């Protein structure tokens, strides 16, 4: 199977592949079981993916009736051996708060005894979709995930840093056994040893062993001070360039760390980008709108392809939130469809395995559809994902733009 460049950040768009190829049905001996011509001219039926003719209309869910937010997602396009383009949406788990469980999704016609509970429309046209749940555990597909820890390295965060270092290896092994191909990165922020920046250290995306080695250089919050890896010098230069100066090296601003990772780290094409922000302080943008949590509300600023943020909050105190100065860091999760968890200031009542982000990754989905040839014109197209559980306890809609790429004329 040919795999093309998946997602390139554009202004408010998901770009699914910058490539040229023709979609031709090369049916020959043995191919008929895989590619079938639908009775409707021009519509291909790829084995395992229902045709658009089988698709049903998505439920209409008014915004005021939505019960949750869907996670941000990536969209990619692949050409199979027979020259047919298949679009895939990679999304982490959807939590069913009413039933206290992660939702298993079923596409067109239902599957595994489940009735359909997820729908995809492209430019208001229902698509026939196939859904793979990693929770089913058959290992037939691998989900790419690039996970970045944003760690507040102020003096009060030693226990969190120590807990992360102690648990990362076993935790990553458990995630891998769930069918995840995962890489890890880290950004330390707040109380930087460098002047005029909140970015105190970090390591680009690496293996679990690579991240553990980085964290094991020292103890406490010193674990996330300084840069390591092949591009350590480049990361330090970027951190101290002035671009990530939010007024003070002591401002604890998770948004600065997020923007740093987004702009400087080498994310893999097609990987689901996941961030976990560990902090015990408000987001402190120092008056700068670019570092405010509200930056994430606008999909032109932060597209679904750029990832979902999960929050670990280790402060039982109360705050009077002030926009642009002392902001609720959990809003980073709210605006991107992530999760939040409160833990005690000593990180003694939680493990990495307990965090909601673990369940979200272990219950990821791959949603596939085809018949996109007419959409491969280099222009943005509107994709809408609708989720409605059988008991209607979970009702949510996410809409975003995708450029599916270009095909040869």
Task: Give short role names for the model-derived ranges.
Residues 2-14:
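Bacterial N-terminal signal peptides that target proteins for export
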């Amino acid at each position: 199977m040919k795999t093309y460049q998946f997602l390139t950040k554009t202004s408010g768009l998901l770009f699914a592949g910058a490539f040229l190829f023709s979609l031709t049905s090369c049916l020959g001996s043995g191919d008929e079981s895989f590619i079938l011509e639908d009775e409707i001219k021009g519509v291909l039926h790829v084995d395992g993916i229902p045709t658009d003719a089988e698709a049903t209309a998505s439920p209409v869910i008014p915004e005021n009736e939505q019960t949750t937010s869907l996670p941000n997602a990536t969209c990619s396009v692949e050409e199979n051996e027979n020259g047919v383009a298949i679009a895939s949406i990679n999304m982490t788990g959807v939590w069913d708060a009413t039933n206290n469980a992660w939702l298993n999704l079923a596409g067109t016609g239902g599957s595994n005894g489940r009735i359909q509970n997820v729908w995809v429309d492209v430019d208001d046209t229902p698509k026939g979709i196939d859904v793979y749940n990693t929770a089913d555990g058959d290992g037939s597909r691998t989900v790419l995930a690039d996970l970045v820890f944003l760690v507040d390295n102020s003096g009060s965060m030693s226990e969190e840093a120590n807990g992360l270092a102690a648990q990362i290896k076993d935790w990553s092994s458990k995630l891998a056994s769930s069918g995840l191909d995962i890489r890890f990165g880290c950004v330390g922020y707040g109380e930087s040893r460098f002047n005029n920046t909140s970015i105190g250290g970090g390591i680009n995306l690496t293996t679990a062993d690579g991240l553990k080695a980085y964290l094991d250089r020292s103890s406490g919050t010193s674990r996330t001070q300084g840069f390591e890896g092949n591009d350590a010098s480049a990361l330090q230069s970027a951190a101290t360039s002035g671009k990530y100066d939010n007024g003070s090296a002591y401002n604890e601003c998770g948004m600065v760390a997020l923007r740093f990772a987004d702009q400087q780290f080498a994310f893999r094409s097609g990987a689901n980008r996941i961030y976990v922000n560990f902090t015990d302080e408000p987001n402190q943008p120092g008056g700068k709108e670019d570092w405010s949590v509200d930056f994430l509300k606008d999909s032109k600023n932060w597209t679904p392809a750029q990832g979902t943020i999960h929050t670990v909050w280790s402060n039982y105190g109360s705050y009077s939130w002030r926009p642009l100065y002392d902001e609720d860091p959990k809003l980073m999760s709210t605006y991107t469809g992530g999760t939040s968890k409160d833990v005690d200031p000593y990180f003694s009542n939680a493990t990495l395995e307990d965090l909601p982000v673990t369940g979200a990754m272990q219950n990821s989905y791959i949603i596939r559809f085809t018949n996109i040839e007419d959409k491969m014109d280099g222009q943005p197209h509107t994709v809408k994902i609708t989720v409605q559980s059988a008991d209607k306890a979970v009702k949510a809609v996410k809409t975003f733009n995708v450029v599916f790429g270009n095909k040869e004329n």
